[in-house]
């Protein structure tokens, strides 16, 4: 383990992980489209999201100060958790550049500042394409990196497309008064993903190292059409219809991945 940086007072660095997760599907009829929205609304209601974020608090090592949660009408949910740091010495595994735990290996450790999640179900008015977006922000103040929560969160949602941003702001001083604008090594957000996750996604990085800003976009490689069909009406699609639906879905996913409208 590298020698620890001796600080003058508290570590004042703020580390923020922001990411958007998209789940795409095709629902042919208006009835199936509304059923999809209801399904998502029930599957990821405020109570379920609270449990997921509480697990994140354990992963990054935090204490819960307050939880505010809300289910919205007609759809969507939000949860905000305020968290605080304990005076506990971080372990090497909590600060090194490596993947965080998977859902089945969660261990509670120590803690930080706030976590928020918002959900956005959406349906295309004509094409039958339905999108479920989850926006999550994990902001910590101190030595622990919120990137440790990334691996777990991707496995908690049906993630077809993921956009991740990580930035470090502020500075902290060592005992000699020298400023430090980042306190850990990082070359890519991808280093915090497990091997199976890296293998499953096509990934692109845009990093601004001198500004301590890191960006990774992820697109699921494997495409099985049956995993994207929702509702009874999709059970009897003809071969030609299946080809058309697959074309629409792939086009939708590429537009979201590249964040721009593309010609058909």
Swiss-Prot record:
Coiled coil: none annotated. The record marks 112-113 as: Cleavage (non-hydrolytic). It catalyses: S-adenosyl-L-methionine + H(+) = S-adenosyl 3-(methylsulfanyl)propylamine + CO2. GO terms for biological process: spermidine biosynthetic process. Its EC number is 4.1.1.50. Is synthesized initially as an inactive proenzyme. Formation of the active enzyme involves a self-maturation process in which the active site pyruvoyl group is generated from an internal serine residue via an autocatalytic post-translational modification. Two non-identical subunits are generated from the proenzyme in this reaction, and the pyruvate is formed at the N-terminus of the alpha chain, which is derived from the carboxyl end of the proenzyme. It holds the Pfam family AdoMet_dc. Pathway: Amine and polyamine biosynthesis; S-adenosylmethioninamine biosynthesis; S-adenosylmethioninamine from S-adenosyl-L-methionine: step 1/1. The modification Pyruvic acid (Ser) is found at residue 113. One of its GO terms (molecular function) is adenosylmethionine decarboxylase activity. One of its GO terms (cellular component) is cytosol. NCBIfam families: SAM_DCase_Eco. Belongs to the prokaryotic AdoMetDC family. Type 2 subfamily. This is S-adenosylmethionine decarboxylase proenzyme. It comes from Azotobacter vinelandii (strain DJ / ATCC BAA-1303). The gene is speD.
């Amino acid at each position: 383990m590298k020698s620890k940086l001796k600080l003058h007072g508290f570590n004042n660095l703020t580390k923020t992980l922001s990411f958007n997760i998209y789940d795409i599907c095709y629902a042919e009829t208006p009835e199936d489209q509304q059923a999809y929205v209801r399904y998502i609304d029930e599957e990821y209601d405020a109570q379920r999201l609270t449990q997921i974020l509480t697990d994140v608090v354990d992963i990054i090592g935090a204490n819960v100060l307050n939880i505010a949660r809300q289910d919205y009408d007609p759809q969507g949910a939000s949860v905000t958790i305020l968290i605080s740091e304990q005076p506990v010495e971080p372990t090497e595994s909590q600060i090194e550049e490596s993947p965080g735990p998977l859902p089945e290996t969660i261990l509670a450790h120590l803690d930080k500042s706030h976590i928020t999640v918002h959900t956005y179900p959406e349906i295309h008015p004509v094409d039958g394409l339905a999108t479920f977006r989850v926006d999550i922000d994990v902001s910590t103040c101190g030595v622990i990196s919120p990137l440790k929560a990334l691996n777990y969160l991707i496995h908690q949602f049906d993630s077809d497309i993921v956009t991740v941003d990580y930035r470090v702001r502020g500075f902290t001083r060592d005992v000699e008064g020298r400023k430090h604008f980042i306190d850990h090594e990082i070359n890519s957000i991808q280093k915090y993903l497990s091997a199976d996750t890296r293998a499953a996604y096509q990934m692109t990085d845009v990093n601004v190292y001198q500004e301590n800003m890191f960006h990774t976009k992820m697109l699921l490689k494997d495409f099985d059409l049956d995993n994207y069909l929702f509702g009874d009406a999709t059970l009897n699609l003809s071969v030609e219809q299946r080809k058309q639906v697959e074309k629409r879905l792939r086009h939708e996913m590429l537009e979201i991945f590249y964040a721009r409208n593309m010609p058909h």
